[in-house]
Amino acid sequence: MYSAGPPAVPAPRRCRRPPPGRPMQPPRPPAPAPVPAARPPPPAPGPRPRVAVKMAFRKAYSIKDKLQAIERVKGGERQASVCRDFGVPGGTLRGWLKDEPKLRWFLEQLGGEVGTQRKKMRLANEEEIDRAVYSWFLALRQHGVPLSGPLIQAQAEAFARQIYGPECTFKASHGWFWRWQKRHGISSQRIYGEAEPVAAGPAPGPPVKQEPAQPTRAGPLPDRAASTPAPAEGGYGDEQIYNANVTGLYWKLLPEQAAPVGAGGCGRRWRGDRVTVLLAANLTGSHKLKPLVIGQLPDPPSLRHHNQDKFPASYRYSPDAWLSRPLLRGWFFEEFVPGVRRYLRRSCLQQKAVLLVAHPPCPSSEARMPALEESEETRRRCRPEPTGPPEELQTPDGAVRVLFLCRGSGRAHIPAPLEQGVVAAFKQLYKRELLRLAVSCAGGSPLDFMRSFMLKDMLYLAGLSWDLVQAGSIERCWLLGLRAAFEPRPVEERAGQPAGQAEEAAEHSRVLSDLTHLAALAYKRLAPEEVAEWLHLDDDGGLPDGGREDWGPSRPPVLVPGGPLLPASLPSAVAGGAEEEEEEAIPTAGEAVRGLETALRWLETQDPREVGPLKLVQLRSLISTARRLGGIGPSPMVPDDGL
């Protein structure tokens, strides 16, 4: 057996001695006991650092969604089920139920389905202007009128002045227009080419009550009205029906030159003095197009280096000064269609119109011009009939077109509306202004006046005379020209006709009185019968072929000075004041002509509308008189258009 002995004593730990040459290091002291860490001091007062906190996603609901939730709750569905489907808490749904009257009212203010897509109930700052512009926009889009941003902005400012007065400072900026578009859901689209007029605007809006179409005063149109369908339903309104008429005019013929043989007049006429004038206007007379003057000069000197678009009348060349088919076609597409489209767009009307012409023009310009002494029946027989069917004149979309009232000799002649007194009134007004110019230039001979009165002055006189024709006269002439095509007028309109006719008769008599007075003032030996013959000389005729023709012995007319003379009632001291002044050196004829030509060059550079033809004609007449008295040759500053 083993016996327990004394406990074993562990052997002492040997210390490793450092290698020779290295000192022995002392033993490491025991590690101190760990001391508990003290709390950090509280942070100093100041802005707390941002801490990224994950927030719940916030969704905005449209008015349409809110109304759907309200309708489901009103239908008996539990609010918890509706909240679960829409993902909103119960408090949000109860807020929607509380704001239901406000939501309905907001939809009434915006109108249509556009408001249901809105997420905020925010109206415009100027609600009246916004509502007026939107109603105006819907009304125009119902008629297919294209609208641009600047046009809508200008109309908004006009509404602001009407609502708040002329002192209103409202400005329809681009930002206002953008917000107005977004508020009503209107988009901008670019239009390419000429498209059919749309029936309704692109913006959805409230249903507009359609009123029955009012009967227009134009009835069935002859020949082509039934065969060619209108570009849009509803026919043509009064402002969309136009008429064009052609007439001849001696544009510088004075009463003394038109005196018959044996009456003591010169009776000499010039072929170059005759032009053809095309007049066109709509039924109401509210839109009168620029007169078209057709002459025999291919390049009139007085029209060179001038912008003819600024003249109140247009000029075209024809060998016989008559309207041909190419001229009618060019005028239709270059002047009539653009002018009518601008007027219809400005008047907020549908882009369609019809032009009534008495008969188609000659296919060529070789028609014999009837003599003045021939009867009316002979004149009509001399007018050649078209060799082929008349050309279809209309725009590619068919919105603007031409209808001929008479196509041939076998059909009944339908008088054009403008032939019922409007053309005669235009000629009387033109000749009155021509006589006024002749009287104002009474210091020289009639030949000086005829040389100084150029084709450019004639265009201004033609435009002025056409502007003086009243719109009521044009409207009344339609009842005489196409009486069977109009529907019966109401009693109140028929009762008002005599007053208008009496006013027109008074205006006609006043023009005739002015003509007689001016003729008596300018010509001493002229009888009233000769003035009447001069007025009606170019009603239906042209000139015989052969250029210049003498109808009797020539005699220069006697012109009574009636221009810038001093009245006889003035005292002699005033009339003879110039003699008492100190005499100065008299300029020579060359110096006077050079000064007058310098003044003419300056005057022609001014605005023609402010200067007018009177001053130019007077100055040219003075130049011709000075050259004639000084024995100087013709002036290059006074070109001759008609002689």
Curated annotation (Swiss-Prot):
- Which residue numbers delimit the HTH CENPB-type domain? 117-190
The subcellular localization recorded is: Nucleus
| Region of interest called Disordered, as start-end residue ranges on this chain | 1-50, 197-236, 366-395
HTH psq-type domain location = 52-103
The family this protein is said to belong to: Belongs to the tigger transposable element derived protein family.
The protein's matches in PANTHER family, at most eight in alphabetical order, are given as: TIGGER TRANSPOSABLE ELEMENT-DERIVED PROTEIN 5, TRANSPOSON
Cellular component, GO, one term? nucleus
Q: Which SUPFAM superfamilies match?
A: Homeodomain-like
The Gene Ontology terms for molecular function here are: DNA binding
**UniProt DNA-binding residue ranges:** 79-99, 150-183
Q: Know the name of this protein?
A: Tigger transposable element-derived protein 5
Keyword tags: DNA-binding, Nucleus
> In the record, which residues are listed under signal peptide?
none
Q: Which Pfam families match?
A: CENP-B_N (PF04218), DDE_1 (PF03184), HTH_Tnp_Tc5 (PF03221)
Coiled-coil zones? none
Any idea where the DDE-1 domain is? Answer: 238-358
List the InterPro entries. Answer: CenT-Element_Derived, DDE_SF_endonuclease_dom, Homeodomain-like_sf, HTH_CenpB_DNA-bd_dom, HTH_Psq, WH-like_DNA-bd_sf
